[in-house]
């Protein structure tokens, strides 16, 4: 049986850390930023991790 292919879109959006957690980018941070407060934008820079309910699905997309 051939190897599973990695979903390339998912590979660009997620990064697996040494601890096994999967890091992701924050939503609401790409455009229409002028109306968002500095505090809100600063908090969006903080690292975000995939929730435990979604880890299995993301791991399948990443073929790991």
Swiss-Prot record:
Highest taxon of source: Bacteria
GO CC aspect terms: cytosolic large ribosomal subunit
Keywords of the record: Ribonucleoprotein, Ribosomal protein
GO molecular function annotation: structural constituent of ribosome
Pfam family, any one: Ribosomal_L35p
BP terms from Gene Ontology: translation
Family: Belongs to the bacterial ribosomal protein bL35 family.
HAMAP family: Ribosomal_bL35
PANTHER family xrefs: 54S RIBOSOMAL PROTEIN BL35M, LARGE RIBOSOMAL SUBUNIT PROTEIN BL35M
Name of protein: Large ribosomal subunit protein bL35
The species this protein was found in: Nautilia profundicola (strain ATCC BAA-1463 / DSM 18972 / AmH)
Lineage: Bacteria, Pseudomonadati, Campylobacterota, Epsilonproteobacteria, Nautiliales
Gene that this sequence comes from: rpmI
